[in-house]
Amino acid sequence: MTNIRKSHPLIKIINDSFIDLPAPSNISAWWNFGSLLGICLALQILTGLFLAMHYTSDTTTAFSSVTHICRDVNYGWVLRYLHANGASMFFICLYLHVGRGLYYGSYLFKETWNMGVILLFAVMATAFMGYVLPWGQMSFWGATVITNLLSAIPYIGTNLVEWIWGGFSVDKATLTRFFAFHFLLPFIISALVMVHLLFLHETGSNNPTGIPSNVDMIPFHPYYTIKDILGLFMMILILLSLVLFSPDMLGDPDNYMPANPLNTPPHIKPEWYFLFAYAILRSIPNKLGGVLALVLSILILIIIPFLHTSKQRSMTFRPISQCLFWLLAADLLTLTWIGGQPVEHPYVIIGQLASILYFLIIIAIMPLAGLMENHLLKW
């Protein structure tokens, strides 16, 4: 009798994706983040579902409903802080996952990579709308500033912004629709994740050497299931440490003040995981230019496969490209720091230089380094 694991139409799909999946024998801990992202998504959907049972998306009661969750609902504070800090863990894993793809040349699986970029945009949109829901000061002003950026679009900009707002300012209609979309998008993301995995399993995983590993594959279970569980425990340890010891460390104190359209906070800034893009936006004095730079800072990932000039796939054996990669990582950390600082000297000029460097490294310096390494290796 055939094993049900291999014959049942549904269980067979799970088996081929997570149990008998052939995986390269040499993939490192950098390949753990895909499964961690899946767990983060499941955690966010679960905690979000329970929070939605107690939350009200009305401008008069939204802030107090979040307070009610924290004070009166059984373990409501755990749910709220798991959800808020779970988003931070989600983005840490996301950025490390993208960084791994850049370093090891995984972007040459174009369909998987492009699907990943779409997923990144979807997760960013979801996180932005989620930040608006507690209806604190930073929620309200963040929503106002970011949605207002669309008014930079020529001709239709103003109409588009008012259409998104559902009125002439961020108000009840905006909050209600943001809640609806924030609830819906994670399920769309789940579907996109399945497409992402479908494309990945068409080609199989890349590995640290960048050399095809068809000759040396091992089953995903038990080797990588146990490895992923170790990564999961480490992530849960960090997440629970955040939630139980310093739940507000990554948040903004201004969000503990109810939204007030008549009082602008001194420094409007998004959550830490958007600061690098916010710094790029602010570094350009022109509104439309800033918006374009903001969108391109993420959209540039789409063209990375076409900028690959090296004869080698991975950066493992390319020291010049490695130095540039870590320079890019340092540059992104600098941009993240600048995004949280006020718009004054010397932060403005540092932000502008870091923004120029970001685009220069990706568009020009890295492709040139690839060509140079080919020449050095007499290829």
From Swiss-Prot:
PROSITE patterns reported for this sequence: CYTB_CTER, CYTB_NTER
Binding site for a ubiquinone: H201
One annotated GO molecular function: metal ion binding
Binding locations of heme b b562: H83, H182
Topology term for the membrane: Multi-pass membrane protein
Transmembrane segments: 33-53, 77-98, 113-133, 178-198, 226-246, 288-308, 320-340, 347-367
Binding residue positions for heme b b566: H97, H196
Pfam families associated with the record: Cytochrom_B_C, Cytochrome_B
Record has Transit peptide as a keyword: no
Cofactor detail note: Binds 2 heme b groups non-covalently.
GO biological processes: mitochondrial electron transport, ubiquinol to cytochrome c
Origin superkingdom: Eukaryota
GO CC terms of this entry: mitochondrial inner membrane; respiratory chain complex III
Keywords: Electron transport, Heme, Iron, Membrane, Metal-binding, Mitochondrion, Mitochondrion inner membrane, Respiratory chain, Transmembrane, Transmembrane helix, Transport, Ubiquinone
Subcellular location: Mitochondrion inner membrane
Subunit structure: The cytochrome bc1 complex contains 11 subunits: 3 respiratory subunits (MT-CYB, CYC1 and UQCRFS1), 2 core proteins (UQCRC1 and UQCRC2) and 6 low-molecular weight proteins (UQCRH/QCR6, UQCRB/QCR7, UQCRQ/QCR8, UQCR10/QCR9, UQCR11/QCR10 and a cleavage product of UQCRFS1). This cytochrome bc1 complex then forms a dimer.
Additional comment: Heme 1 (or BL or b562) is low-potential and absorbs at about 562 nm, and heme 2 (or BH or b566) is high-potential and absorbs at about 566 nm.
Family label: Belongs to the cytochrome b family.
Function: Component of the ubiquinol-cytochrome c reductase complex (complex III or cytochrome b-c1 complex) that is part of the mitochondrial respiratory chain. The b-c1 complex mediates electron transfer from ubiquinol to cytochrome c. Contributes to the generation of a proton gradient across the mitochondrial membrane that is then used for ATP synthesis.
Protein name stated in the entry: Cytochrome b
Organism: Pipistrellus hesperidus (African pipistrelle)
Gene field: MT-CYB
